[in-house]
């Protein structure tokens, strides 16, 4: 037998033990060691748990997905769009400039360098995923083999305006008219909740694919 004394400790103990300066610049990238550790930690959480947000965006189970699809009053093609879109909730992070071919991408959630210009995340390492237009393009390609093209501006040009009353699951919604805001955002309409509130599934910056 041995007598043990256990003391709880936080990350600072490990950093001190290995002499890691969290404010030092991480080699080859314009981020600090602290930022690199945070990004890699998120990538690990996404791989292990399907979410980097400590459970705030849990994945949708197959049973929940089937119940949701059964509640929709729309065509089979639109339900397939929703099935594909909702299958990524809580499983794929937001990544500036992130695009993907149809189907599951094994590189999602792995640490990658953000190379697309125009974001505060450019030049940093983040868990690989999709951006907002990359998500809507992936959904349409995977579900129907239809391309919407890359970027919110191109997707706007590939669609036409409808009224709010005409909205059906799978329709696109835009934060603003292209050119009127520095950065736009595109979402997929997913119907209404029990209280009549409109639901949207989209790839949100800093979160990933979410239904709200």
Regions found by a protein language model. Give the residues of each.
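Intrinsically disordered, low-complexity segments enriched in small/polar residues
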Residues: 17, 32, 48, 53, ...
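Short linear motifs in intrinsically disordered/low-complexity regions
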Residues: 11, 132, 155-158
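Membrane-proximal envelope biogenesis segments
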Residues: 1-72
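N-terminal capping segments
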Residues: 42-133, 141-143
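...with weaker cross-activation on analogous glycine-rich loops/strands in unrelated enzymes
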Residues: 137, 141-211
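Intrinsically disordered, low-complexity, compositionally biased regions/tails
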Residues: 23, 38, 54, 59, ...
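Generic hydrophobic, helix-prone segments enriched in Leu/Val/Ile
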Residues: 1-3, 14, 85, 94, ...
């Amino acid at each position: 037998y041995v007598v043990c004394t256990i003391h709880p400790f936080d990350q600072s103990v490990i950093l001190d033990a290995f002499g890691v300066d969290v404010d030092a610049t991480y080699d080859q990238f314009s981020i600090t060691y602290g930022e690199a550790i945070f990004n890699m930690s998120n990538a690990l959480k996404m791989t292990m748990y399907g979410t980097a947000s400590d459970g705030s965006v849990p994945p949708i189970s197959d049973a929940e997905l089937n119940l949701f699809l059964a509640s929709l009053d729309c065509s089979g093609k639109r339900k397939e769009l929703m099935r594909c879109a909702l299958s990524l909730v809580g499983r794929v992070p937001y990544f500036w400039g992130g695009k993907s071919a149809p189907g599951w991408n094994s590189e999602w959630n792995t640490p990658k360098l953000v190379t697309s210009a125009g974001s505060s995340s450019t030049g940093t390492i983040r868990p690989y995923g999709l951006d907002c237009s990359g998500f809507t393009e992936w959904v349409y390609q995977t579900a129907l083999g239809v391309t919407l093209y890359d970027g919110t501006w191109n997707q706007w040009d590939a669609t036409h305006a409808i009224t709010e009353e005409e909205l059906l699951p799978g329709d696109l919604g835009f934060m603003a008219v292209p050119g009127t805001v520095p950065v736009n955002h595109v979402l997929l309409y997913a119907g209404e909740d029990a209280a009549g509130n409109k639901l949207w599934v989209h790839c949100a910056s800093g979160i990933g694919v979410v239904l709200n």
